[in-house]
UniProtKB/Swiss-Prot annotation:
Cellular component aspect of the GO annotation: cytoplasm
Coiled coil: none
Family: Belongs to the NnrD/CARKD family.
Superkingdom as given in the UniProt entry: Eukaryota
Chemical reaction(s) catalysed: (6S)-NADHX + ATP = ADP + phosphate + NADH + H(+); (6S)-NADPHX + ATP = ADP + phosphate + NADPH + H(+)
Positions contributing to (6S)-NADPHX binding: 119, 172-178, 239
Annotated keywords: ATP-binding, Cytoplasm, Lyase, NAD, NADP, Nucleotide-binding, Phosphoprotein
Residue stretches making up the YjeF C-terminal domain: 3-313
Full protein name: ATP-dependent (S)-NAD(P)H-hydrate dehydratase
Pfam families documented for this protein: Carb_kinase
Keyword match Transferase: no
Entries under InterPro entries matching the protein: Carbohydrate_kinase_pred_CS, CARKD, Ribokinase-like
Known cofactor(s): Mg(2+)
Length: 318
């Protein structure tokens, strides 16, 4: 069965019987003083795709801007940054991080999926806290997307996601090379071979390598997504993909728990199916936006095409 037809099973129905939250509660960890757009794009992409609620966990410096971008988002200035800890010693900083993660825990436990990285920056304190959050959600079994600056955590500590079968890494070309280097893999020649080696080195996690053709690898399994897309790469495009992917993982989680249908274990909705559908869908959104805007395309242009693209690919029977 085609990947798209299989994935349609996890899409929640449009029904008055569902209440708020059943179609997905997701979170975005990211947003710093310099980077407030990235978490916004990821969060709004998930909402436009069709999840019900999105929580953005960001630095205090980023919260006012993100709140002003959209009233649809629930924004928590929860992430401790270096600016918050300028006069603290390392032990005090660590205690501050632990306290902040503990305060987030009740919300983290309720999420259907989480994306870590958009706009996170290279702030060492924010990265340290993001690492604790990743450890927490892995202990909960929560589906996880690690993108952008969040991938620095995996570069620094490859064991962080080792063997976790509910995570998708979404590196671009340069991030992919750095991830490969962190586990002594040569990515300079054959990208397919390197992707398989990287996935296996991390315990067969799923990797979605973004490029002119998106490459998805889980262990020895590999596939390409080469659907038409925008001919111009704009800032925020990867954040949109991360948000879509997070939404799709949330739906998979809801489907597997029998939230809107009887539990059906007869068909395994693998992370490769989820990733390939997210890739294809994001490329369709970008292609529609490019048709209208050409060189003027920006990430907000792509957000506006999520609804039409979804109708075209998945809701064509409505």
């Amino acid at each position: 069965m085609a990947a798209r037809e299989v994935f349609k099973r996890v899409i929640p129905p449009l029904s008055t019987r569902l209440h708020k939250g059943q179609s997905g509660r997701i979170g975005v960890v990211g947003g710093s003083l310099e980077y407030t757009g990235a978490p916004y794009y990821a969060a709004m992409a998930a909402l436009y795709t069709g999840v019900d609620l999105c929580h953005v966990f960001c630095a205090q410096d980023a919260a006012p801007a993100i709140k002003c971008y959209s009233p649809e988002l629930v924004v928590h200035p929860s992430i401790v940054s270096k600016r918050d800890c300028e006069h603290l010693n390392p032990v005090a900083i660590d205690n501050c991080i632990e306290t902040a993660v503990d305060r987030m825990s009740p919300l983290l436990c309720r999420l259907d999926s989480l994306v870590v990285g958009p706009g996170l920056s290279r702030d060492p304190v924010m990265l340290a806290m993001a690492k604790r959050i990743v450890e927490k959600v892995i202990s909960l079994g929560t589906p996880l997307v690690i993108d952008a600056d969040g991938l620095c955590l995996v570069e620094q500590t490859p064991g962080l996601v080792m063997g976790y079968q509910n995570v998708i890494l979404t590196p671009n070309t340069n991030e992919f090379k750095r991830l490969c280097h962190s586990v002594n893999i040569d990515a300079s020649e054959n990208c397919e071979v390197a992707a398989v080696q990287l996935s296996k080195a991390l315990g067969s996690v799923t990797i979605l390598c973004k490029g002119s053709k998106d490459l998805i690898a889980t262990g020895d399994d590999i596939l390409f997504v080469s659907d038409p897309t925008s001919l111009r790469r704009c800032g925020g495009q990867g954040d949109v993909l991360a948000g879509i992917l997070c939404a799709f993982l949330a739906w998979r989680n809801g489907y597997q728990s029998g939230r809107w249908t009887a539990q059906d274990q007869s068909t395994d909705i693998s992370l490769m199916i989820v990733a390939s559908n997210a890739s294809s869908f994001a490329r369709k959104c970008a292609a529609l936006a490019f048709e209208k805007h050409k060189r003027s395309i920006v990430a907000s242009s792509i957000l506006k095409e999520i609804g039409p693209a979804f109708d075209s690919l998945y809701d064509d029977e409505l």
